[in-house]
Amino acid sequence: MTIADHQARILPLFKKLTSLSPDPLPEAERDPRLKGVGFLPRGTLFSCFHEEHLAEAETLAEALVEAKNFDDFIALATNARAVVNEGLYAFAMSVAILSRDDCNGVVLPPIQEVFPDRFVPAETINRALKVDKVSDPNKDTVVPIQKTGNIRDPEYNVAYFREDIGINSHHWHWHLVYPAFYDADIFGKIKDRKGELFYYMHQQMCARYDCERLSVGLQRMIPFQNLDDELEGYSPHLRSLVSGLSYGSRPAGMHLRDINDCSVQDMERWRERILDAIHTGLVTDSHGKEIKLTEENGLNILGALIESSHDSVNKPFYGTLHNWGHVMIARIHDADGRYRTNPGVMDDTSTSLRDPIFYRYHRWMDNIFQEYKHRLPSYTHQQLDFPGVRISRVTVRSKVPNLIHTYSKDSLLELSHGINLKGHIQVKYEHLDHEPYNYEIEVDNRTGEARETCVRIFLAPKYDELGNRLILEEQRRLYIELDKFHRRLEPGKNVLVRASGDSSVTLSKVPTFEELESGNANVNPNEYCSCGWPEHMLVPRGKERGMDFYLFVMLTDYEEDKVQGAGEQTICSDAVSYCGAKDQKYPDKKAMGYPFDRPIQVRTPSQFKTPNMAFQEIIIQYEGHKH
């Protein structure tokens, strides 16, 4: 059977999951391999942050991965679809598809079409359901998306970012590729530097969010600091079609409260133990043995502890700080479940980015990681330099050199694959985008021989919310990675050109359900893995009058950076910076975020710069809505 045949048999299993029968298959009709699943009731919201939900998802994913061949896998998946919770099924099934060798090249259907109720406001879906009853089923009908707030709430100014379908889909897919329960011994594939990727991907989301806040005239976010902080209010305007209930809203001024499975005191205890480990440079494993946090492994160990994942060296002692925090915030309005309400959006990876507290909470997590980073020495001139290689000029080639235009545009989302409709109803929604551009890097190779180089490109705002120039130590945590790629430098002058659409951070194209069904998806199965930052959100919005940014370009020695066992032709090479390379080593020896991952003692770019670096001032200008 071909990849297309496998794709065609998998897609129907993701259709209409919001409309499954509430009653599971009787036990007598269940595959005996499904003995350990079916405990989370259908019609309730699944959370991959909740220990019990995660344990059941792990059991199902393992059973699906262990199916003896593809036909057996499809038979077991079909049986499981009629047994387990709807959200749990989609999660475990997706993890299994990404893990099975006979599913290599199969593209997961976009989660926004599988569960559109997680991405589209309830008012819009309600309108679509009404329109569907009276519209011609043979014609496409378009319903405009409804707004979820207004300018009385300053945070609504960045709703375009928080509610972006692409970034919420990215977060869902990242946690599929790196599920907390992942055990390499069972699934048989490595997840290299998983703990460090957990840190870096979320750190980058926070940096991007702050860039967007500065773009719309808001101050940078204030981190969540203490577990007794009062939280801001938030109403998601989402209603689950699986449960029939709205996602929980949070009035302003509420505090975290104990939930049935975890107390606020547990969270405080875990945080202090993790900080103790950072400050002593030692973690204690479950056998009482001390493990040193080195420059090479420290962040990876801490990432696993903080999340915490299967790789945590001592989960009973260091706890599950990140995951239980998500659940605790999501249940703040009904901590002990007495009102039988749905949790808030923080409970789910495909919805949590909508809530402003997500970014403040993750900046708190990032501050813990930064405690560790501050214990490492700053990079020396020798560690930063690439002797004999000098960047003479960097230019962004667009309509106007060193000026990138951004704008808002409309796109359509099909509802009929996820919701039981008689016709084709599409939602028209607005999202940020940017004009395509190229990086043009002029390099002088004075080594007298051809050299291989890794090109690293970052972007950060030049000024803070008050118009003051940011010093490098403040600015380094705002640097967002735009691209990283490998090139050969011939002796003498070289001009390196790279298109923005080729970024190692972004997904170039997300195929729709319809394109996957028809076989017209037009994606290279060896490159596409669903995990990656959306291409339309590569650069921040900027301001109508233009906003000043530093474009940072650095060339490093590829011979020092390359990793044994990380091939040039990687499976899923579309977005390796945030998602890694599937089943292979992370293709870069340097720390993620290098050279901005460690404290910087000097204040300005000119003091930090080595000849193999360039800080180019550019402007990003927002042009409004494009029809």
Curated annotation (Swiss-Prot):
Hemocyanins are copper-containing oxygen carriers occurring freely dissolved in the hemolymph of many mollusks and arthropods. Cu cation 2 binds at H322, H326, H362. It comes from the Eukaryota. Glycans are attached at N445. Gene3D superfamilies: Di-copper center containing domain from catechol oxidase, Hemocyanin, C-terminal domain, Hemocyanin, N-terminal domain. This is Hemocyanin D chain. Belongs to the tyrosinase family. Hemocyanin subfamily. GO terms for cellular component: extracellular region. Pfam families: Hemocyanin_C (PF03723), Hemocyanin_M (PF00372), Hemocyanin_N (PF03722). Its main location: secreted. The two copper ions bound each have 3 nitrogen ligands (presumably contributed by His residues) and share a bridging ligand (possibly contributed by a Tyr residue) in addition to binding oxygen. The keyword Protease does not apply. One of its GO terms (molecular function) is copper ion binding. The keyword Secreted applies. Cu cation 1 binds at H171, H175, H202. Tarantula hemocyanin is a 24-chain polymer with seven different chains identified. The gene is HCD. Disulfide bonds join C531-C579. Hemolymph. It is found in: Secreted, Extracellular space. Keywords: Copper, Disulfide bond, Glycoprotein, Metal-binding, Oxygen transport, Secreted, Transport.
